[in-house]
Amino acid sequence: MAISIHPPRDPNTLSNYNNWICTHITANFDILFDQKKLVGNVIHKLKSTTNGESQEIILDSNHVAIGDVKIDGRPSEWELLPPLEPYGSALKIKLDQGVNLNETIDVEISVQTTEKCTALQWLTPAQTSNKKHPYMFSQCQAIHARSIFPCQDTPDVKSTIDFNISSPLPVIASGLPVRDALGASKSEGKSLYQFHQRVPIPSYLFALASGDISEAAIGPRSVVATSPDKVQECQWELEADTEKFIGAIEKIVYPYAWGEYNVLILPPSFPYGGMENPIFTFATPSIISKDRENIDVIAHELAHSWSGNLVTNASWEHFWLNEGWTTYLERRILAAVHGEAYRHFSAIIGWKALTDSVEHFGHDHEFTKLITDLKGKDPDDAFSSIPYEKGFNFLFHLETLVGKQKFDRFIPHYFTVFKGKSLDSYEFKATLLDFFGTDAEASKLLNDLDWDTWFYAPGLPPKPQFDTSLVDVVYELAQKWKSLSETSSFKPQLSDIESLSANQIVVFLEQMLLLERPLTPELSKLMGEVYGLSKSENIEVANLYFQLGLKAGDENVVDPATELLGRIGRMKFVRPLFRSLQRVNREVAVATFEKYKDFYHPICRAMVEKDLFGKRDV
């Protein structure tokens, strides 16, 4: 009897999840900071989806050390299949006999992570904000959970999870914390931390972090967790908007399903923006800007609590169903809080990111399509703003086509039909057409839509008509500055930007960076002084102003730029700032890198090495 290793919907898993479905995972791990590994076991409850026809279980696994495997408590035969890159070496477990349809078995696997684990990052005390303790966090999206423990590593399977984690330092996981048992004492200086995830989630949302972590309330159902020295400023940054955001999206979709919505602010060397791990969003500290203006990322990660986490793409080929929907809902939250013009402003910024990504890949590249072909490919290689922004523009087009009022009725319907499930683009299309089937006008418009072009054509989609009111004022200001390098009566003053949001100032600075002829050092200094940009606590703003000043050859920004490089490790800021700095003063750039390289995450450090030195041994 043939067992298919490649199930029909997800080409990026080696598991035979068409024969078995994991319904529950118990994860028991010790965090060993000195050895930089997790040691323990996982128990999978697997339900048979055939009537005794499958006599083997195949799980994804990559660079994990497996001790033994038991089926319902009895030792079982197992082997690791030859590696098939980039998917790892599948774990094949033999059964003595098949299992009846819908009956379950428990598969217990003792496991250790190895130094080749791609999901876990281990930070030294030097890479944290108060420099006192080591830190560990996971990032399992897209196919990295299999490097922590063997599993059905596909978004097409969802399981409930119990976490039992021992660590000498506080632990965060993607489940509801058992707060009365948190840190229950255990021997050898370790405590046991327990979390329960009662909503079934895919493997990529399995998340762990451990380090010197404190918590503070930011709403009636929310806490922020971060380093004790940063907890108050993080609380201030997030407490004004978090519950407001939750209330806004609950009106658009339906009530929040996860109990608590919390935010873990990671150490400053975290190289990314954010990750939507359920119950605890993992976020970059660069959103803590002391002006509450960088928290759009929280609206985005919160929106994932519906799109992605509850209703999930069946494979990474349909990633737009996660990210396009989430970007659409994020902007609906922003519209509810800041007004409709702000949604369009955010979409205009997104359109620029989309055009940049299409330019990067090339207009006819496979990865610029809404539905991508990822057979034999690593989903991480396809990652870009395209599923976010092309996906958003498709949904915005559908909203415009049928009318916002009608589309608003479809939103909760869609998220109800697929709640707790995974779907592909074809099911999305069928559900949309079915919902509007009794509305002759909307039905005709949707049936006449060129679905194949939207789904399969590479490159940019048609550009929508956006409300440009919030960018027009910014473009006008940029034009005035451009005229200063010629002859102009324009006299810059603080009132030019007093009514602008931080995001508008970001767009203004991006426009200034596009000037063919850079500002003079004098004008750069004038801008920094008059607008207060040189002292901005908002890293999005400060980073761009320093790039602008360096491009202008303004020596006044060198010191603050190097100081910024010593306190943030997000690659979005670090790489362009080093590139700008080395063009002005390579000696300072190299010295700054040597001074702070141990602070940076290894991925960031390697990238900056390449930027500064080309290829050399790290």
Swiss-Prot record:
<dbReference type="InterPro" id="IPR042097">
    <property type="entry name" value="Aminopeptidase_N-like_N_sf"/>
</dbReference>
<dbReference type="InterPro" id="IPR045357">
    <property type="entry name" value="Aminopeptidase_N-like_N"/>
</dbReference>
<protein>
    <recommendedName>
        <fullName>Leucine aminopeptidase 2</fullName>
        <ecNumber>3.4.11.-</ecNumber>
        <ecNumber>3.3.2.10</ecNumber>
    </recommendedName>
</protein>
<dbReference type="GO" id="GO:0061957">
    <property type="term" value="C:NVT complex"/>
</dbReference>
<keyword id="KW-0479">Metal-binding</keyword>
<dbReference type="InterPro" id="IPR015211">
    <property type="entry name" value="Peptidase_M1_C"/>
</dbReference>
<dbReference type="InterPro" id="IPR012777">
    <property type="entry name" value="LTA4H"/>
</dbReference>
<keyword id="KW-0378">Hydrolase</keyword>
<dbReference type="InterPro" id="IPR027268">
    <property type="entry name" value="Peptidase_M4/M1_CTD_sf"/>
</dbReference>
<dbReference type="Pfam" id="PF01433">
    <property type="entry name" value="Peptidase_M1"/>
</dbReference>
<keyword id="KW-0862">Zinc</keyword>
<keyword id="KW-0539">Nucleus</keyword>
<dbReference type="InterPro" id="IPR049980">
    <property type="entry name" value="LTA4H_cat"/>
</dbReference>
<dbReference type="GO" id="GO:0004177">
    <property type="term" value="F:aminopeptidase activity"/>
</dbReference>
<keyword id="KW-0645">Protease</keyword>
<keyword id="KW-0482">Metalloprotease</keyword>
<feature type="binding site">
    <location>
        <position position="304"/>
    </location>
    <ligand>
        <name>Zn(2+)</name>
    </ligand>
</feature>
<dbReference type="GO" id="GO:0005771">
    <property type="term" value="C:multivesicular body"/>
</dbReference>
<comment type="function">
    <text>Aminopeptidase that preferentially cleaves di- and tripeptides. Also has low epoxide hydrolase activity (in vitro). Can hydrolyze the epoxide leukotriene LTA(4) but it forms preferentially 5,6-dihydroxy-7,9,11,14-eicosatetraenoic acid rather than the cytokine leukotriene B(4) as the product compared to the homologous mammalian enzyme (in vitro).</text>
</comment>
<dbReference type="GO" id="GO:0030163">
    <property type="term" value="P:protein catabolic process"/>
</dbReference>
<dbReference type="Pfam" id="PF09127">
    <property type="entry name" value="Leuk-A4-hydro_C"/>
</dbReference>
<dbReference type="InterPro" id="IPR034015">
    <property type="entry name" value="M1_LTA4H"/>
</dbReference>
<dbReference type="InterPro" id="IPR001930">
    <property type="entry name" value="Peptidase_M1"/>
</dbReference>
<keyword id="KW-0963">Cytoplasm</keyword>
<feature type="active site" description="Proton donor">
    <location>
        <position position="388"/>
    </location>
</feature>
<feature type="binding site">
    <location>
        <begin position="139"/>
        <end position="141"/>
    </location>
    <ligand>
        <name>a peptide</name>
    </ligand>
</feature>
<dbReference type="InterPro" id="IPR038502">
    <property type="entry name" value="M1_LTA-4_hydro/amino_C_sf"/>
</dbReference>
<dbReference type="InterPro" id="IPR016024">
    <property type="entry name" value="ARM-type_fold"/>
</dbReference>
<feature type="binding site">
    <location>
        <position position="323"/>
    </location>
    <ligand>
        <name>Zn(2+)</name>
    </ligand>
</feature>
<dbReference type="GO" id="GO:0005829">
    <property type="term" value="C:cytosol"/>
</dbReference>
<dbReference type="GO" id="GO:0043171">
    <property type="term" value="P:peptide catabolic process"/>
</dbReference>
<feature type="active site" description="Proton acceptor">
    <location>
        <position position="301"/>
    </location>
</feature>
<feature type="binding site">
    <location>
        <begin position="271"/>
        <end position="276"/>
    </location>
    <ligand>
        <name>a peptide</name>
    </ligand>
</feature>
<dbReference type="Pfam" id="PF17900">
    <property type="entry name" value="Peptidase_M1_N"/>
</dbReference>
<dbReference type="GO" id="GO:0004301">
    <property type="term" value="F:epoxide hydrolase activity"/>
</dbReference>
<feature type="binding site">
    <location>
        <position position="300"/>
    </location>
    <ligand>
        <name>Zn(2+)</name>
    </ligand>
</feature>
<dbReference type="GO" id="GO:0008270">
    <property type="term" value="F:zinc ion binding"/>
</dbReference>
<dbReference type="GO" id="GO:0006508">
    <property type="term" value="P:proteolysis"/>
</dbReference>
<dbReference type="GO" id="GO:0006629">
    <property type="term" value="P:lipid metabolic process"/>
</dbReference>
<dbReference type="GO" id="GO:0000328">
    <property type="term" value="C:fungal-type vacuole lumen"/>
</dbReference>
<dbReference type="GO" id="GO:0120113">
    <property type="term" value="P:cytoplasm to vacuole targeting by the NVT pathway"/>
</dbReference>
<comment type="similarity">
    <text>Belongs to the peptidase M1 family.</text>
</comment>
